Amino acid sequence: MGSSSKKKKEKQKDFQKPKLKVGKPKQKPSNFTDTSFKTKSIVVNQQTLTTEGLDSAELFKQNLTLAVNAKSDNQRRDALAYVTNQLSANPANNPVGTVGVLTKVLPLITDGASSVRVQLLKLFRTLPPQEVRPHAEKILLYIRGGMTHLSNDVRTDTLNVLDWLLEVAGDEVVSCPGGWLKTLNSFSSMLGWNPNVSSAMTTKGWTSAPKATLGMKKGPESQAKQIQVLAKFLQTGFRPEEPLPYKPRAYWDNIYRLPTTPNPFAYLNLFGLPRDEDSEMYPDRMSRLRVFDMKWRAAITSGMETAKKEGGTVGRAAAILDKALKASLESDGSMQVN
């Protein structure tokens, strides 16, 4: 009997409302957890790389990844500086190869920080030219994107990258798929020298149609830089090919030996998408000159004459462009300069 009455009392406790005494807090449940404590947080303004236990190859890869993924401009710049120092060392420390470096850092051409873009150009100049040439087409894709960027500073720094690429891989730039006409289209967007507008020229010269350009808010220096790089691009495309020395076995080597250049049959476009005129390859000087005369000479000549009248830095840059255009005519036996 005693046990049954005890059980009844225990069950009744669950349904009894406890009486609260005035001035005393409510009784805490048995499973109460105190959450009133606070922990001290440590905030690090700048991340640091832990170099302990990492060899030079892993440290190189870590900095290469940080150069692309870091949120801070200073971090990306410092990581690029580390990679640049490793590439310029003697011997160079590059565990991922030139193609691995380019794949990672090419998107930084349009980076929003000027210091990052300047450091990126220094990195490009440390790469071996013979290893850059096979990737000229890939680099040009990012360069053309930077040439049509909304920021004038990005466009100017991109022209510096194109200037470097013309120095180390000029022939590959003008002869790769899309390297000739698509790059000229990008210059057209920057300068506003539209071939469709030039076709509607009047007897007075340049048409009065609106000039669709990406802006000249930085003054004549920006336009002069664009014209100078355009002149260098045209000089590279119109440069006569150097004759190859006579080799009696060259004929048989071309037939039976493996090619010494990457993708030697790219001009056939066996496995790629169909190309339009702008995406086509123009591997020799005569083909580039022919399509230039057909689509671009009138527009560039008209824009050049207008730029020469402005004088100053723009006029001097236009004079360099004029020499490049005249040189293309003089070296062509079928055309004469007036």
UniProtKB/Swiss-Prot annotation:
Cell compartments where the protein resides: Nucleus
Main location: nucleus
Its job: Component of the RIX1 complex required for processing of ITS2 sequences from 35S pre-rRNA.
Pfam families xrefs: Ipi1_N (PF12333)
Swiss-Prot/TrEMBL GO biological process terms: rRNA processing
Biased composition (Basic residues): 1-10, 18-27
SUPFAM superfamilies: ARM repeat
Organism lineage string: Eukaryota, Fungi, Dikarya, Ascomycota, Pezizomycotina
Family statement: Belongs to the IPI1/TEX10 family.
Region (Disordered): 1-34
Keywords: Nucleus, Ribosome biogenesis, rRNA processing
Quaternary organization: Component of the RIX1 complex, composed of IPI1, RIX1/IPI2 and IPI3 in a 1:2:2 stoichiometry. The complex interacts (via RIX1) with MDN1 (via its hexameric AAA ATPase ring) and the pre-60S ribosome particles.
Alphabetized InterPro entries for the sequence: ARM-type_fold, Ipi1_N
GO cellular component: nucleus; rixosome complex
Full protein name: Pre-rRNA-processing protein IPI1
